[in-house]
Protein backbone atom coordinates (compact mmCIF):
# COMPACT_ATOMS: atom_id res chain seq x y z
CA UNK A 1 0.00 0.00 0.00
CA UNK A 2 2.90 2.39 0.76
CA UNK A 3 4.08 2.25 -2.85
CA UNK A 4 0.59 3.02 -4.13
CA UNK A 5 0.30 5.91 -1.65
CA UNK A 6 3.67 7.30 -2.76
CA UNK A 7 2.57 7.11 -6.40
CA UNK A 8 -0.71 8.86 -5.59
CA UNK A 9 1.18 11.59 -3.70
CA UNK A 10 3.39 12.15 -6.73
CA UNK A 11 0.35 12.39 -8.98
CA UNK A 12 -1.16 14.99 -6.64
CA UNK A 13 2.11 16.96 -6.46
CA UNK A 14 2.44 17.01 -10.26
CA UNK A 15 -1.17 18.14 -10.67
CA UNK A 16 -0.64 20.86 -8.07
CA UNK A 17 2.49 22.10 -9.82
CA UNK A 18 0.64 22.29 -13.15
CA UNK A 19 -2.24 24.16 -11.51
CA UNK A 20 0.19 26.64 -9.99
CA UNK A 21 1.80 27.20 -13.40
CA UNK A 22 -1.60 27.89 -14.94
CA UNK A 23 -2.53 30.36 -12.19
CA UNK A 24 0.38 32.58 -13.26
CA UNK A 25 -1.33 33.21 -16.61
CA UNK A 26 -3.60 36.11 -17.53
CA UNK A 27 -7.19 35.13 -16.81
CA UNK A 28 -8.63 37.68 -19.22
CA UNK A 29 -8.24 34.98 -21.90
CA UNK A 30 -11.11 32.48 -21.76
CA UNK A 31 -8.86 29.67 -23.00
CA UNK A 32 -6.62 30.24 -19.97
CA UNK A 33 -9.68 30.19 -17.69
CA UNK A 34 -10.75 26.89 -19.26
CA UNK A 35 -7.27 25.46 -18.71
CA UNK A 36 -7.18 26.56 -15.08
CA UNK A 37 -10.61 25.04 -14.47
CA UNK A 38 -9.48 21.75 -15.99
CA UNK A 39 -6.31 21.72 -13.89
CA UNK A 40 -8.31 22.60 -10.76
CA UNK A 41 -10.69 19.69 -11.42
CA UNK A 42 -7.78 17.30 -11.90
CA UNK A 43 -5.91 18.57 -8.83
CA UNK A 44 -9.03 18.22 -6.70
CA UNK A 45 -9.51 14.64 -7.94
CA UNK A 46 -5.93 13.77 -7.07
CA UNK A 47 -6.25 15.48 -3.67
CA UNK A 48 -9.31 13.61 -2.44
CA UNK A 49 -8.00 10.33 -3.77
CA UNK A 50 -4.66 10.76 -1.99
CA UNK A 51 -6.54 11.62 1.23
CA UNK A 52 -8.61 8.45 0.84
CA UNK A 53 -5.53 6.31 0.23
CA UNK A 54 -3.68 7.90 3.16
CA UNK A 55 -6.61 7.21 5.50
CA UNK A 56 -6.85 3.62 4.26
CA UNK A 57 -3.11 3.22 4.76
CA UNK A 58 -3.52 4.39 8.37
CA UNK A 59 -6.32 1.88 8.93
CA UNK A 60 -8.78 4.72 9.52
CA UNK A 61 -11.00 4.60 6.51
CA UNK A 62 -13.49 2.01 5.41
CA UNK A 63 -16.63 3.97 4.70
CA UNK A 64 -15.35 6.75 2.45
CA UNK A 65 -16.00 5.88 -1.14
CA UNK A 66 -16.73 9.35 -2.45
CA UNK A 67 -15.19 12.81 -2.12
CA UNK A 68 -17.64 14.15 0.49
CA UNK A 69 -17.20 11.26 2.94
CA UNK A 70 -13.43 11.28 2.40
CA UNK A 71 -13.28 15.02 3.11
CA UNK A 72 -15.31 14.58 6.30
CA UNK A 73 -13.07 11.77 7.48
CA UNK A 74 -9.90 13.70 6.54
CA UNK A 75 -11.14 16.69 8.55
CA UNK A 76 -12.07 14.49 11.51
CA UNK A 77 -8.57 12.98 11.52
CA UNK A 78 -6.84 16.33 10.95
CA UNK A 79 -5.39 15.77 7.47
CA UNK A 80 -7.10 19.02 6.53
CA UNK A 81 -7.90 22.02 8.73
CA UNK A 82 -11.00 23.39 7.05
CA UNK A 83 -13.56 20.85 5.94
CA UNK A 84 -15.95 23.58 4.81
CA UNK A 85 -13.50 24.95 2.24
CA UNK A 86 -12.90 21.43 0.92
CA UNK A 87 -16.65 20.83 0.59
CA UNK A 88 -16.90 24.20 -1.20
CA UNK A 89 -14.09 23.07 -3.52
CA UNK A 90 -15.92 19.83 -4.21
CA UNK A 91 -19.12 21.70 -5.04
CA UNK A 92 -17.23 24.09 -7.33
CA UNK A 93 -15.54 21.14 -9.04
CA UNK A 94 -19.02 19.66 -9.57
CA UNK A 95 -20.29 22.96 -10.99
CA UNK A 96 -17.47 23.15 -13.50
CA UNK A 97 -17.74 19.48 -14.45
CA UNK A 98 -21.44 19.45 -15.22
CA UNK A 99 -22.07 22.80 -16.86
CA UNK A 100 -20.21 25.75 -18.24
CA UNK A 101 -20.91 29.36 -17.50
CA UNK A 102 -18.15 31.88 -18.14
CA UNK A 103 -18.97 34.05 -15.12
CA UNK A 104 -19.05 31.03 -12.81
CA UNK A 105 -15.76 29.80 -14.26
CA UNK A 106 -14.02 33.15 -13.69
CA UNK A 107 -15.35 33.30 -10.13
CA UNK A 108 -14.09 29.79 -9.43
CA UNK A 109 -10.68 30.66 -10.87
CA UNK A 110 -10.53 33.58 -8.44
CA UNK A 111 -11.38 31.22 -5.56
CA UNK A 112 -8.70 28.81 -6.74
CA UNK A 113 -6.15 31.66 -6.69
CA UNK A 114 -7.28 33.12 -3.36
CA UNK A 115 -8.25 30.08 -1.27
CA UNK A 116 -8.14 26.67 -2.85
CA UNK A 117 -4.47 26.64 -3.85
CA UNK A 118 -3.60 27.36 -0.20
CA UNK A 119 -5.62 24.34 0.94
CA UNK A 120 -3.93 22.12 -1.64
CA UNK A 121 -0.53 23.23 -0.33
CA UNK A 122 -1.58 22.61 3.27
CA UNK A 123 -2.49 19.05 2.29
CA UNK A 124 0.85 18.67 0.53
CA UNK A 125 2.64 19.91 3.64
CA UNK A 126 0.76 17.37 5.77
CA UNK A 127 1.61 14.54 3.38
CA UNK A 128 5.28 15.57 3.25
CA UNK A 129 5.58 15.53 7.05
Place the predicted regions along the sequence by residue:
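Solvent-exposed interaction patches of small proteins and small membrane subunits
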Residues: 1-129
Amino acid sequence: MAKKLDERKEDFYKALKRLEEALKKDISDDIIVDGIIQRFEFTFEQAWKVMKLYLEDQGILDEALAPRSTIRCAFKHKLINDGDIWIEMMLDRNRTSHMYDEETAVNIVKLVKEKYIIEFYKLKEFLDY
